[in-house]
Regions:
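Polybasic, lysine-rich low-complexity intrinsically disordered segments
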Residues: 13-14
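Short, positively charged and aromatic/hydrophobic N-terminal segments
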Residues: 19-20
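Non-catalytic, conserved peripheral segments adjacent to functional cores
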Residues: 23-131, 140-141, 146-148, 158, ...
Length: 189
């Protein structure tokens, strides 16, 4: 690779530790799925689906500024150098786990409570391959420490628009959610 960039390769394993594929080349994965840096939030993404049908503004709750697609989906890649910065959406968002290492997802609710979910395939150890995040919930994610990469998907309905995205303020979250200080520091810029 050019510019001294290190080529990363990992072997994917199933729950029994057996190889299930050829070594994963992260740069190749980015090219194959046309993944680009996700502005403000972090990680890499590519929109994989956007419904061609639209909901008129008058059919939506007041929190939406205009018409919206019925739904959208993206691929989302996390690496050790990236994280999904704390943010919230005006729509529900569902995470889907596809490949790689477990991901820690911090969710902070409006009532002041919060929870850290682990997205992955080891169900015996409390991981979930799918997590639904309700609208208005502050959320951010990172690879579990020691992880090499994770390929996820997210689905949003009504469909995602950047106008529906709000990046969190670190000081505000620290004041409101003192039980999650370490993760808030990790997942904010």
């Amino acid at each position: 690779m050019t510019g001294g960039e290190e080529r990363r390769r990992w072997v994917l394993k199933n729950q029994e530790g057996c190889d299930t594929s050829q070594p994963m080349d992260i740069e190749k994965l980015k090219r194959m799925l046309d993944l680009k840096p996700l502005p403000s939030e972090g990680g890499y993404y590519a929109e994989s689906y956007r419904s061609t049908e639209r909901l008129a503004r008058e059919c939506l709750p007041k929190r939406y500024s205009g018409e919206r697609s019925f739904g959208t989906a993206i691929y989302f890649l996390l690496t050790p150098e990236t994280f999904s910065a704390m943010h919230r959406l005006v729509s529900d968002e569902v995470y889907h786990f596809y490949l790689g290492d477990p991901v820690e997802l911090l969710c902070l609710r409006e009532d002041g409570s919060g929870e850290i979910f682990t997205i992955g395939t080891d169900l015996d150890h409390g991981m979930r391959p799918q997590i639904a995040v309700p609208r208005g919930t502050w959320q951010g994610s990172r690879l579990r420490p020691g992880g090499k990469f994770a390929l996820l998907g997210t689905t949003v309905a009504p469909g995602f628009e950047f106008a529906d995205f709000e990046l969190a303020n670190r000081a505000d979250l620290l004041r409101r959610y003192p039980s999650f200080v370490e993760m808030i520091h990790t997942l904010t810029r």
